[in-house]
């Protein structure tokens, strides 16, 4: 049997486990391939990969990108999440994710102010 989970989150975004704990939980469930797809960040990837080096599990780089899609005919906007796998840690991606991080921080600040 070959266990795969291609959509997971650590506490770096909205999960509850550290990247290392997430890898260990996957191992406990006999998962052999795991993608860490935190929201708008790849900051936990290195930690997951480092932990996985001593274990029998493959880590796939990934990210869940928050986006907006607008329907021109109704002028409505919809939140869309795009799971991207096998992401390379290159400058254009880093810039985009840093921008996303700023947008998420501003959104969190606005939500907090409304409480």
Predicted segments, located by residue:
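Extended substrate/RNA-proximal surfaces in nucleic-acid metabolism proteins
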Residues: 53-114
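An N-terminally biased module of ancient metal coordination in phosphate/nucleic-acid-related enzymes
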Residues: 1-79
């Amino acid at each position: 049997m070959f266990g795969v989970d291609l959509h997971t989150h650590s506490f770096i975004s909205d999960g509850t486990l550290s990247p290392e704990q997430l890898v260990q939980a996957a191992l406990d469930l006999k998962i052999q391939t795991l993608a860490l797809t935190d929201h708008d960040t790849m900051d936990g990837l290195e930690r997951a990969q480092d932990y996985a080096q001593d274990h029998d599990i493959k880590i796939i780089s990934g990210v869940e990108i928050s986006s907006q899609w607008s329907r021109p005919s109704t002028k409505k906007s919809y939140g869309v999440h795009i799971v991207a796998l096998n992401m390379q840690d290159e400058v254009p991606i880093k810039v985009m994710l840093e921008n996303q991080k700023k947008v998420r921080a501003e959104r969190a600040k606005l939500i907090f102010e409304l409480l």
